[in-house]
Amino acid sequence: MSAWGTDNKYLFSLYQGENLGEEQSVVGEIDKDKIPITGNSRFGCWCCTMVKEDKSLQNFIDHGAEELRPLRRFRNWLVELRATPEARDWRRRNGTVYFNAEGELGRGPFTLESRKLILKELLKLEIETGFELITIEELKMIDKMWEDEGDLTRRALVDIYYEVKGTRLPWQER
């Protein structure tokens, strides 16, 4: 039972492999009507690029969750973008530079231009899927971060939002 009073069996079944082992019986019976997805996968954000392939997301799709295909497409695009040197700053957020194991200049976070592109594609994905993928509160925090990191006009985020969604953000000046 979770802290919120819900049954954890379903969540457990999502991260279970299709062949349950003996040790899982301690947790309890897995509902066979639930979709067992995969073990040994990431736990966390669906768009995490720390692993090359999101097996959990793929298995949801393989088991009939077709509505998740656009999320996989976006995530795979993010993985490709992350590997694109031009999309990344050569400095880390703390201003330092480093060399990787091959002796090449390492990469820091996405450039502001790359982040603008990512936001634009994410907002388009929201429209395509009907899922809320980013909240107004998160957008406001990003807007402030972008101002601190080089968007001195403080227009980039609100302009992208209006361009894609066709509506204004609550804090946007008219």
For each feature predicted by the language model, list its residue ranges:
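Extended, charged low-complexity segments
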Residues: M145-R174
